[in-house]
């Protein structure tokens, strides 16, 4: 599939033909080629998606300011309604067409349409977009532990409409909303909503056709309705139907997707078409037994993920998303927290098709000060509304997140003043009610890091509370077991509880061979400690079946300008060398930012979650040297039933089962090197193998 055009219409058709072709009365083109300048003097050619922090984002001080993008497009019929559709312009954007300002959008991650009809002319037109990623105390995020990149980091489209069309200004990117107020194994009720515009100077009679299409393309349901629309007017279309025996969307086991399509006709002439993928499912959270999908227990276990990549920042392409989701599928996760802001729509399309359940959230992060203005809270509501309107149809989304860690740093006099807990409680209640008015069916909650110790936090108006826990990393030194003790207290206070973050910094190129030295080290971030951290947390998670979802922090390393840690490398555990490339990074990822190195813990979780293939993986494999006279403690992550270990071709041990609670951590008996360079091989019962080489440390 060449590409999915996310706005307007026939997703399957558009992917197969030229983006600027005539599509049943709807003309659209992706605007990919732009010129870019930071100073308005020197210009360079760039391709959208583009972030002007793609290179300097991984540094001590990345550029925060404005920059201008400009391009040209041709209009053949200036009387027709035209829209620019931005899938994300960070962090705020002023849009001009032929020098006329047509939009001032505040928020860097949600899609928005701009009606440019009054500003265009027949022939060549110029569009200019001024992006600005400076801190703005009235726009979220104000402060956060991730970079606030700037630019047109998501695609941009130009769309020309017929005289009557489905409005892009009411129901987001797909121009229609598909609600399922009742889903049961034997019956599904569906409500389809869209707004039909008539821009002509006469009343018209149109036919709106609604279709439900099976995954194989066959027609499951169809209905036509005649609608009279007055001149220069609109019509709120709503169609409800009930179908029995539908195929449910059942997570990673069976992510079955239907297509809902609406077509607009005047006589036999089709004027417009819009469609969206939908998946029918029902679910609930249980305070004692966890998450249920379609009536059955379905524990959600997975990872969090930023929209970020080395050399691109937030400007990922569809191929980048496909690669990342292949990695998620390999991992075997059935849950994703897409943090800390709405990601590009294509990311949710991937989750839909793979059956991965998602929490997505607005970037209200860290800051709620006593001097916060009403404009700040208005922006929070605006971004929530845009997120829900644009992403509503995705079956993968079961959780809307309102905020993250409103109890930590970032609240000071240089920003909005000191922390205002009363405002958090009050504004959370208002935001919750607003989100529920937009979507009464999904769960709405928050991600806290205070262990609900703030007065009033136990009374937050939420459907669920998630905790970000770093016992043994940021606090409770050398006491990883404090994680479950804290969670037990939180669970008793809150009922429905999740873990939205847990993790430790891991430099995959920093190692120690001595078990006594496997401790937290701010400069080194030993991989061995990261392994121990995740192993301990998972053992504790196994004892907390009431957790609805857990998400390890985080799938990929990502840059943070203010961080300087985990930058000392060692492949022998004795000599260490500074690696500047590891600075200014949050390295809690299971995979490095460039996607080139899967850390040990990636294979730990793969062994736990991926049941479709056998995993056999030596840990500490990037430790290349070891003292000859010391005991070597080889450890393997594997979901095999038996493992046989060989040293230099000779069998030294055979284990039946790992002998511990996770069933995937295999610790072999101590042994010692026999030559200057020993080879170790482990073989599973089905023949799957892994091999490492260790040289004598001199």
Question: What positions do the PLM features span?
Answer:
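Bacterial Sec-dependent N-terminal signal peptides
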Residues: 1-23
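An acidic-aromatic loop/edge-strand motif
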Residues: 25-33, 40, 46, 50-59, ...
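Accessory beta-strand-rich segments of carbohydrate-active enzymes
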Residues: 37, 64-169, 199-200, 356-357, ...
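Extended substrate-binding grooves/exosites of carbohydrate-active enzymes
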Residues: 51-59, 100, 134, 139, ...
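Extended acidic/polar, glycine-enriched regions
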Residues: 120-124, 193-286
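Surface beta-strand/loop "capping" patches
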Residues: 163-200, 606-640
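Beta-strand-rich binding/interaction modules
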Residues: 187-227, 237, 632-654, 677-684
């Amino acid at each position: 599939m060449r590409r999915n055009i996310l706005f307007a219409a026939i997703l399957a058709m558009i992917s197969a033909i030229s983006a600027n072709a005539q599509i049943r009365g709807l003309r659209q083109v992706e605007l990919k080629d732009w010129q870019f300048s930071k100073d308005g003097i020197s210009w360079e050619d760039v391709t959208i998606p583009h972030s002007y922090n793609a290179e300097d984002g991984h540094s001590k001080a990345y550029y925060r300011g404005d920059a201008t993008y400009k391009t040209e497009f041709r209009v053949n019929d200036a009387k027709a309604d035209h829209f620019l559709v931005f899938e994300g312009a960070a962090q705020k954007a002023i849009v001009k067409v032929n020098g006329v300002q047509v939009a001032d959008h505040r928020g860097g991650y949600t899609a928005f349409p701009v009606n440019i009809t009054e500003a265009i002319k027949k022939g060549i037109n110029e569009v200019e977009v001024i992006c600005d990623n400076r801190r703005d105390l009235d726009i979220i995020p104000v402060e956060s532990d991730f970079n606030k990149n700037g630019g047109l980091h998501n695609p941009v489209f130009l769309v020309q409409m017929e005289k009557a069309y489905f409005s892009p200004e009411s129901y987001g990117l797909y121009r229609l909303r598909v609600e399922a107020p009742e889903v049961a194994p034997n019956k599904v009720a569906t409500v389809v909503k869209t707004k039909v515009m008539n821009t002509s100077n006469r009343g018209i009679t149109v036919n709106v056709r609604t279709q439900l299409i099976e995954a194989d393309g066959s027609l499951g349901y169809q209905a036509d309705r005649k609608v009279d629309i007055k001149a220069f007017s609109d019509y709120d279309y709503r169609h409800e139907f009930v179908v029995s025996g539908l195929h449910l969307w059942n997570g990673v086991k069976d992510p079955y997707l239907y297509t809902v399509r609406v077509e607009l006709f005047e006589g036999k002439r089709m004027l417009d078409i819009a469609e969206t993928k939908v998946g029918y499912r029902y679910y609930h959270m249980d305070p004692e037994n966890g998450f249920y999908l379609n009536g059955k227990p379905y524990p959600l276990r997975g990872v969090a993920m930023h929209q970020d990549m080395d050399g691109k920042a937030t400007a990922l392409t569809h191929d980048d998303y496909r690669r990342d989701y292949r990695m998620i599928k390999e991992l075997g996760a059935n849950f994703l927290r897409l943090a800390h802001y709405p990601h590009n729509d294509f990311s949710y399309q991937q989750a839909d098709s793979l059956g991965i359940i998602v929490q997505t959230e607005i970037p209200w992060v860290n800051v709620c000060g006593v001097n916060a203005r009403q404009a700040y809270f208005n922006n929070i509501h605006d971004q929530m509304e845009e997120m829900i309107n644009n992403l509503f149809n995705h079956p993968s989304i079961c959780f809307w997140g309102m905020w993250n860690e409103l109890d930590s740093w970032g609240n000071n006099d240089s920003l909005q003043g000191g922390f205002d807990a009363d405002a958090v409680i009050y504004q959370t209640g208002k935001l919750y009610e607003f989100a529920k008015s937009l979507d009464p069916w999904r769960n709405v909650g928050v991600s806290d890091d205070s262990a609900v110790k703030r007065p009033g936090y136990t009374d937050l108006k939420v459907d669920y509370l998630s905790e970000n826990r770093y016992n043994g990393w940021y606090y409770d030194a050398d006491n990883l077991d404090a994680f479950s003790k804290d969670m037990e207290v939180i669970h008793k206070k809150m009922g429905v509880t999740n873990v939205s973050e847990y993790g430790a910094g891991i430099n995959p190129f920093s190692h120690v061979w001595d078990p006594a030295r496997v401790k937290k080290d701010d400069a080194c971030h030993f991989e061995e400690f990261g392994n121990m951290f995740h192993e301990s947390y998972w053992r504790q998670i196994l004892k907390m079946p009431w957790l609805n979802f857990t998400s390890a922090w985080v799938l990929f390393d990502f840059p943070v300008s203010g961080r300087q840690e985990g930058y000392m490398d060692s492949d022998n555990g004795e000599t260490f060398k500074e690696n500047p490339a590891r600075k200014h990074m949050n390295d809690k990822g299971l995979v490095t930012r460039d996607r080139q190195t899967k850390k040990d813990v990636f294979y730990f979780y793969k062994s736990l979650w991926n049941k479709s293939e056998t995993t056999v993986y030596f840990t500490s494999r990037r430790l290349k040297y070891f003292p000859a006279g010391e005991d070597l403690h080889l450890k393997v992550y594997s979901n095999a039933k038996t493992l046989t270990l060989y040293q230099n071709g000779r069998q030294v041990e055979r284990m039946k089962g790992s002998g511990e609670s996770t069933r995937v951590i295999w610790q072999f008996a101590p042994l010692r090197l026999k030559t200057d360079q020993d080879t170790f091989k482990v073989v599973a019962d089905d023949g799957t193998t892994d091999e490492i080489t260790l040289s004598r440390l001199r």
